[in-house]
């Protein structure tokens, strides 16, 4: 079955597998959203079923909640948990300071709330997500539906004074209709190409009326686990300043990989 998975999927899996090893009995764990985070949820589910791992998960989207229930992870709400030991999530881009762009999966608001309510945030990603400067991936911002075009115009006007290379934005669509987040909002994708000052941009965007949250995660991520298609894994801890390398044996099992299609 290993021939059925692309090198990128293998990289995502080994990163998720390595990150799952950070989870211990009794932990309250934030469960991210997206294709890489889905591997993590599957890995944790296998540990719950086969190793007796006892954890409670807080999902960052309805999709993640559904998958977590399918694989046997006990779920609670963030209000019930109050605070989390660890959140593990993917990223669309990350730089050397572990600043992130997230929100490609449409769950940036809940993802940021859960991540900031955790003692530690670990990002899992393949090597292709590492960039020298953020911005090649469109930056998502969540806006309320009321007056979204006005919010869009204000955002584009604000970008004129920001250190970015592009200033256009598009409303994310789901077929012929606007994409709707779990919170009932829309998403504008900002095509910036390069973000010279992510910290400043994150602060300024959230001051614009109608903007609920943006996909820049600044000073939130503590560790990144980078997977490679050959099974190599690199763990970078921004707080400790350490870099560890490891190798994960890639053994596919039907119960772990079946129906993982996102």
Curated annotation (Swiss-Prot):
Enzyme Commission code(s) on record: 5.3.1.6
Residue positions binding substrate: 33-36, 89-92, 102-105, 129
Membrane-crossing residue ranges in chain numbering: none
Entry GO CC: cytosol
Pathway given in the UniProt record: Carbohydrate degradation; pentose phosphate pathway; D-ribose 5-phosphate from D-ribulose 5-phosphate (non-oxidative stage): step 1/1
Keyword Methyltransferase included in the entry's annotation: no
Signal sequence interval, chain numbering: none
Catalyzed reaction equations: aldehydo-D-ribose 5-phosphate = D-ribulose 5-phosphate
Positions annotated as active site in the UniProt record: 111
UniProt GO MF annotations: ribose-5-phosphate isomerase activity
Subunit structure of this chain's protein: Homodimer.
Protein function: Catalyzes the reversible conversion of ribose-5-phosphate to ribulose 5-phosphate.
Family membership noted in the UniProt record: Belongs to the ribose 5-phosphate isomerase family.
Protein name: Ribose-5-phosphate isomerase A
Protein source organism: Ruegeria sp. (strain TM1040)
């Amino acid at each position: 079955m290993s021939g059925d998975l692309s090198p990128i999927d293998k990289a995502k899996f080994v990163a998720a597998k390595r990150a799952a090893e950070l989870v211990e009995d009794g932990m309250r764990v934030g469960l991210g959203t997206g294709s890489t985070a889905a591997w993590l949820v599957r890995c944790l589910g296998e540990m719950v079923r086969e190793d007796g791992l006892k954890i409670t998960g807080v999902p960052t989207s309805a999709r993640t909640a559904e998958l977590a229930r399918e694989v046997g992870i006990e779920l609670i709400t963030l209000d019930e948990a109050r605070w989390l030991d660890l959140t593990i999530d993917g990223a669309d881009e990350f730089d050397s300071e572990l600043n992130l762009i997230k929100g490609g999966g449409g769950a940036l608001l809940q993802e940021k709330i859960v991540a900031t309510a955790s003692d530690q945030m670990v990002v899992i990603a393949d090597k292709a997500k590492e960039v020298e400067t953020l911005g090649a991936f469109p930056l998502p911002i969540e806006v309320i539906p009321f007056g979204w075009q006005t919010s869009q115009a204000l955002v584009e006007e604000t970008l004129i004074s920001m250190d970015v290379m592009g200033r256009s934005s598009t409303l994310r669509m789901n077929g012929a209709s606007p994409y709707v987040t779990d919170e009932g909002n829309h998403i504008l994708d900002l095509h910036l190409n390069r973000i010279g000052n992510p910290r400043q941009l994150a602060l300024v965007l959230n001051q614009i009326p109608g903007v609920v949250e943006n996909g820049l995660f600044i000073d939130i991520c503590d560790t990144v686990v980078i997977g490679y298609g050959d099974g190599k894994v690199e763990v970078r801890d921004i707080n400790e300043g350490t870099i560890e390398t490891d190798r994960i044996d890639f053994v596919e099992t039907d119960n772990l990989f079946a129906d993982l299609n996102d």
